[in-house]
């Protein structure tokens, strides 16, 4: 259908309000500024100046200018700027950043309301004016863009329509900051050379307080984000100078802000122990599939056109037949040539399509570079570039997401081409979120491999950072500014700087004098102390980054079988736990619950539905009573003090309760008969195999209870420990078949204090169990309780567990006691999360677990000390309670151990001898008591030994010794530096002498033999050696 047939159809209209809508894509303001820098880079500019010009009559008080020396634009190129979405850079093989034809408009409109562009190319000077102020003042809905052009030499207008040119210039003079033609020409003269572009943005966006969003006052050398605190904000989020320094992975353009050069960085050259890993994957297909679809569409259209042209040529040839007139032959030849041309184009498009289809199946390869940022360890994470342009920064992956010190300070760098991942329009994210997550997951796996390869964890993470001056425990604190630490950091990371003339990167040799040196903005190759790289003609040396290998942990068949067995066992335990529990989510579920009642005669009151008031908690003397006489009272954490409640004479039912964590259940208090003691059960389902303790609550804390205990034995109540690990209290009272979970008011309040932040909703769980009515013996209960106590002592042990043929450190967080085995639950300090869970159940005493050395006393936590203090206070509190409540203390009496320990004289003598040896070994040289006198002291004399003076003199002597070592080391370092300088001076003198000698030899040879041609030192050496050989 001809285009003329479409002339009556509706067309999409672009209103000037779209200019604002389009600009909202830039949430990050520096991203809008970077769009204008990207345009200069794509125009092959070698320099861009970003500066502000004060204009108090404009909104914001200044204009923001971007001046580059790129290729510039002619009138046709400038006209394409105002076509939204049109870009000449959009080709599959393009390495340019711009792809969408939208950056200039969206970026400039995000910064201000209006912008004016001046550009020069060849003999033309073009001005482009895009103003929302003009549209608002004139009440125009459509987007109108004045675009006048002048001749660069004569400054005469270049136009076919003088009236149109006059209207365009009149609008510029009226609504732009430049009111006359002379002022406009002055802006053109700011563009150096024959080509370049100047973009000026004015009427800037303001904040709610009326100030501009960009701050150019706080730092005259920088453009900063207004009202952004430096604390907790990455430098690149606050300073445009810092953001521009890392904007490109391989900077080849000088960036000046307010006339001061930005020291751009190649991140891989700024890291300690960089290492590269090659990553290959077939998962990145979205962009490649789009390219294949485009190529197939283009190839299909080209094929149809070629077939149609060939068909026309054949038809014309048949129709002409034997007509051999000149006009007929010319017409036939033209049609045939067109058919041949279209066929060639179709074949080319077909080959492109086939190549893209093959490329779709080929895996994509990326290079991950990791290194440690020893200059600022808190600035870590992944920097992800697209076609050398920064898209995402400080992305945490792999072990960094866990928040520990593992992989802390490590920076990763990757450059992703367009065919792998496509960025969003604002160039602050990637369009395909699924493939981007896959990239981050792969980087996390390689990051864990890098951390293992550099072996920082094996040497000690804290020790490593101390070596570079990170002396504070606060991770975000900067390193020490002492000279020795600065030198240590400078020795590991050589200075890499860009020449201001040739734009090549040079790595400078390490010199002590350059540790705190500031290099000038106009640094050039001739300033390089390296003689091989001290001229711009020398080729740029590529950074030599070691190549790492990503190794997946290969499991043996036995390990796979063992892991599978462990998973099956865990799932079975979860299934059994679910089968034994009934979740209560509503009152209807509670009514359906089958609760068994006891087989007592009906002399007691029947079970009632209405709830009664909760009974008071048990007295502390009963709760803390030991399970056997020789046992010590169980310590209670100092953070949980509790008072002994007053015991009422009315018999009430005691209840114990515990609350689960994240996926835990709340406890249900079922209706019960009054004055009827019940067995209590507290069950926690947060672990697959909770600990078991036996409780005999058959005696209530009331001496007037009408019900008597049939057993004449002394009843012992086991201690219920309050630990973070889940516990389970199982009844041991005879003639009871009913087990229900009820709540204890006091313990529920304590649990709520500890867990109110994590547990908001839960569910009731009632555990139904059936026990034989046979009476359980007290001795069996005591043995189980003792075994459980001994097992509980294992909690907190530091152990090593073998996983996949490697040992990992961890801590015992839970203990499970079985019939014939004790199992530990070990939480690892760090393991690769892709192959090993964060914790694991192991059998105590097996080959896969071993104990670590206990920590030193000074590292004991405050909680341990508080528990120790509680142990001392416990007996006193219990005695006080026993005095206040004689009836209860008669039922459960705690007999103190009054047997005195016999003195072992041999042990005392041995300890005295050990003390003598220690004092003699560390005796200061000038101490008034000699070693001989010390050896003759008895135990009474040692008690009065002046330890304070002893320690003082020892510390003074040790300090003097350290100072002498330090002074000797400093003198040696100075001597070594002086020797090094002397050697370097002698080396330079020798090289100069050698060079003069070679020059003289060449001059001598040229006098002897005029046609000799020697250009390099190597040729001279070879020629002399050849002469000596021939002479022999």
Swiss-Prot record:
Q: Give GO cellular component annotations, separated by semicolons.
A: cytoplasm; cytosol; heterochromatin; nuclear matrix; nucleoplasm; nucleus
**Organ and tissue specificity:** Highly expressed in smooth muscle, pancreas and testis.
Under InterPro entries, the record lists:
Chromo_MORC2_6th, HATPase_C_sf, Morc_S5, Znf_CW
Bias type Pro residues, positions:
627-638
N-acetylalanine occurs at 2
**Consequence of substituting residue 27 to K:** In DIGFAN; increases HUSH-dependent gene silencing
> Outcome of mutating residue 326 to E, per the record?
Loss of HUSH-dependent gene silencing. Decreases dsDNA-binding affinity
Which residues are recorded as binding ATP?
Answer: 39, 87-89, 99-105, 427
Effect of changing residue 18 to A: reported as: Abolishes homodimerization. No effect on ATPase activity. Loss of HUSH-dependent gene silencing
SUPFAM superfamilies under this entry? ATPase domain of HSP90 chaperone/DNA topoisomerase II/histidine kinase
Q: Give, from the UniProt record, the effect of changing residue 24 to I.
A: In DIGFAN; increases HUSH-dependent gene silencing
One example of the protein's molecular function in GO is: zinc ion binding
- For binding Zn(2+), which residues are annotated in this chain's numbering? 499, 502, 525, 536
Q: What is this protein called?
A: ATPase MORC2
Q: Which species expresses this protein natively?
A: Homo sapiens
């Amino acid at each position: 259908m001809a285009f003329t047939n479409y002339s009556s159809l509706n067309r999409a209209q672009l209103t000037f309000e779209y200019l604002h809508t389009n600009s909202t894509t830039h949430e990050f303001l520096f991203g809008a500024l970077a769009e204008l820098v990207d345009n200069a880079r794509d125009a092959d500019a070698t320099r861009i100046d970003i500066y502000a010009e004060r204009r108090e009559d404009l909104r914001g008080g200044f204009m923001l200018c971007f001046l580059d020396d790129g290729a510039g634009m002619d009138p046709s190129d400038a006209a394409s700027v105002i076509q939204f979405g049109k870009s000449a850079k959009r080709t599959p093989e393009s390495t340019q950043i711009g792809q969408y034809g939208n950056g200039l408009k969206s970026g400039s409109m995000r910064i201000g309301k209006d912008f004016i562009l001046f550009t020069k190319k060849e003999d033309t000077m073009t001005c482009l004016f895009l103003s929302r102020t003009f549209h608002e003042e004139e009440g125009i809905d459509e987007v109108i863009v004045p675009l006048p052009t002048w001749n660069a030499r004569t400054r005469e207008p270049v136009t076919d329509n003088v009236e149109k040119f006059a209207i365009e210039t009149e609008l510029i003079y009226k609504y732009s900051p430049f009111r006359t033609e002379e002022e406009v020409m002055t802006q053109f003269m700011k563009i150096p050379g024959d080509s370049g572009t100047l973009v000026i943005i004015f009427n800037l966006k303001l904040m709610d307080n009326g100030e501009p969003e960009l701050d150019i006052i706080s730092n005259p050398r920088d453009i900063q984000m207004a009202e952004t605190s430096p604390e907790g904000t990455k430098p690149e989020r606050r300073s445009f100078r810092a953001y521009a320094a890392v904007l490109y992975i391989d900077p080849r353009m000088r960036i000046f802000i307010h006339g001061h050069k930005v020291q751009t960085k190649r991140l891989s050259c700024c890291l300690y122990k960089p290492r590269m890993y090659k990553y290959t994957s077939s998962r990145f297909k979205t962009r490649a599939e789009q390219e294949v679809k485009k190529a197939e569409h283009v190839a299909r259209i080209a094929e149809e056109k070629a077939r149609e042209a060939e068909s026309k040529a054949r038809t014309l040839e048949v129709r002409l037949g034997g007509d051999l007139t000149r006009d007929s032959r010319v017409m036939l030849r033209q049609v045939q040539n067109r058919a041949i041309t279209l066929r060639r184009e179709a074949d080319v498009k077909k080959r492109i399509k086939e190549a893209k289809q093959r490329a779709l199946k080929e895996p994509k390869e990326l290079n991950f570079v990791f290194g440690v940022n020893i200059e600022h360890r808190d600035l870590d994470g992944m920097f992800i570039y697209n076609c050398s342009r920064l898209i995402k920064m400080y992305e945490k992956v792999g072990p960094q997401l866990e928040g520990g010190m593992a992989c802390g300070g490590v920076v990763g760098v990757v450059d992703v081409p367009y065919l792998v991942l496509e960025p969003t329009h604002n160039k602050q994210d990637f369009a395909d979120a699924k493939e981007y997550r896959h990239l981050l997951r792969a980087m996390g796996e390689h990051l864990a491999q890098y951390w293992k390869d550099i072996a920082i964890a094996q040497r000690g993470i804290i020790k490593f950072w101390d070596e570079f001056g990170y002396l504070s425990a606060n991770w975000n604190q900067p390193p020490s500014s002492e000279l020795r630490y600065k030198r240590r950091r400078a020795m590991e990371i050589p200075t890499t700087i860009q020449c201001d003339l040739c734009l090549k990167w040079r790595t400078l040799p390490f010199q002590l004098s350059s540790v705190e040196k500031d290099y000038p903005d106009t640094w050039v190759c001739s300033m390089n102390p390296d003689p091989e790289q001290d001229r711009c003609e020398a080729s740029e040396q590529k950074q030599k980054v070691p190549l790492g290998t990503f190794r997946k942990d290969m499991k043996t068949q036995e390990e796979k079988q063992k892991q599978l067995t462990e998973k099956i066992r865990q799932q079975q335990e979860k299934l059994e736990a679910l089968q034994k529990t009934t979740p209560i989510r509503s009152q209807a579920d509670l009514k359906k619950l089958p609760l068994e009642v006891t087989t007592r005669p009906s002399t007691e009151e029947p079970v009632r539905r209405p709830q009664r008031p909760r009974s008071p908690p048990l007295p502390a003397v009963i709760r803390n009573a030991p399970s056997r006489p020789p046992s010590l009272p169980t310590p209670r954490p100092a953070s949980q003090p509790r008072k002994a409640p007053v015991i009422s004479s009315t018999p009430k039912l005691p209840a114990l309760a515990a609350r689960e964590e994240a996926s835990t259940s709340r406890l249900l208090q079922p209706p019960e008969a009054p004055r009827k003691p019940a067995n209590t059960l507290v069950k926690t389902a947060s672990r697959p195999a909770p600990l078991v303790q036996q409780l005999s609550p058959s005696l209530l804390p009331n001496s007037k209870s009408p019900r008597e205990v049939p057993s004449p034995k002394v009843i012992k109540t086991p201690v219920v420990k309050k630990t973070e690990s889940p516990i389970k209290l199982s009844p041991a009272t005879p003639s009871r078949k009913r087990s229900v979970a009820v709540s204890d008011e006091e313990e529920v309040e304590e649990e709520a204090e500890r867990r109110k932040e994590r547990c908001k909703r839960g569910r009731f769980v009632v555990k139904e169990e059936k026990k034989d009515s046979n009476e359980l013996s007290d001795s069996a209960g005591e043995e189980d309780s003792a075994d459980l106590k001994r097992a509980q002592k294992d909690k907190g042990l530091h152990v090593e567990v073998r996983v996949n043929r490697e040992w990992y450190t961890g801590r015992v967080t839970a203990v499970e006691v079985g019939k014939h085995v004790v199992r530990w639950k070990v939480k690892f300090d760090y393991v690769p999360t892709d192959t090993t869970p964060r914790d694991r159940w192991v059998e105590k005493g097996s080959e896969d677990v071993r104990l670590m050395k206990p920590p030193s006393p000074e590292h004991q936590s405050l909680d341990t000390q508080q528990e120790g203090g509680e142990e001392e206070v416990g007996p006193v509190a219990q005695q006080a309670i026993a005095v206040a409540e004689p009836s209860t203390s008669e039922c459960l009496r705690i007999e103190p151990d009054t047997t005195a320990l016999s003195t072992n004289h041999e042990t005392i003598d041995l300890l005295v001898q050990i003390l003598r040896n220690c004092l003699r070994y560390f005796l200061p040289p000038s101490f008034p008591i000699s070693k001989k006198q010390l050896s003759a002291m008895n135990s009474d004399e040692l008690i009065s030994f002046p330890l304070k003076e002893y320690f003082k003199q020892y510390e003074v002597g040790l300090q003097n010794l350290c100072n002498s070592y330090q002074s000797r080391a400093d003198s040696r370092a100075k001597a070594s530096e002086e020797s090094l300088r002397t050697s370097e001076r002698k080396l330079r003198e020798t090289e100069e002498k050698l060079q003069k000698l070679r020059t003289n030899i060449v001059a001598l040879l040229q006098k002897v033999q005029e046609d000799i041609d020697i250009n390099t030192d190597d040729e001279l050496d070879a020629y002399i050696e050849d002469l000596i050989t021939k002479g022999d």
